[in-house]
Every structure is written in structure tokens, then in C-alpha cells.
């Protein structure tokens, strides 16, 4: 037999059950977030712990520079590596060892690492400028010159955008 008191008690139990489920989900998310935060972040490694492709890039294009720091960033979705040289140059590699970004703030970018079509364009249009930063996004490139000009190249290495 249903009465007012039994209906009110059932509603209270349902509210309590929902509150318990919400609290459990909140605590689960909190624990998962803590785990993810603890398992990500930078860790110092040695050059020999870099992927072989990254080691080859350094040996071929940056052999005259001394490494002062190598880090592995265990991101949530992927990992990356960063190599810092004693002259301030920095290379960032993806998880496979392919370079993603090269910064040469006070030195000349190694010519052999710059795609030939990009080199030719820069020699023709910006003959006195040096590349300070170069990024690679798949087959697309972006360069930043010492005069502040940024140039984006498409996958065929044609100029797509110039920012002054």
C-alpha cells in the first residue's frame, strides 16, 4: 500500500543514489586526471635514447654543435623530444624522430636541412636574411626570418602566405 511517507522515502533514496553516482564519477575523473598528470611531462634523457632518425638528423646537420640538454615530453596523446645545443639552437622532434621545429636564434640554419626550393626562393627574394626558425607540418613548411618576416609554403613548396 502506497502512502505519502513511502513515496517521499523512495524519492529521497533515488536522490541519494544519484548523488552517490555523481560523487563516484567525480572521484573517478579526479583520479584519472591525477594519473594523466603524473604520467606526462618532461624527462631528461641521453642522446642515445632519441629515435634513430633524430640521432641521424643531429649527426648530419648539427654535428658541429654540442648538446647541452635532451628531453622527452610524454604528452597525453603523443610524445616528443627536444634537443638544446650550447649555442642556443633547439630542435623539436616528433615521436618517430622526424624534426618538427628548428630554432637557430643566433646562428645560421644548416643549409642542407632547408628544402632546395625554399632555399632558392629565399636567396632570390630575401638574399640578406637568415632563417631563425623553421617548422614542418607534414609536407608544409613555415620559416621565420631574422627580419621578422614569416613565410608559409604549401606541400609543393610554393609560397602560400607572407607575414611582415
Residue ranges of each PLM-predicted region?
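Interaction-mediating elements
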Residues: 40-164
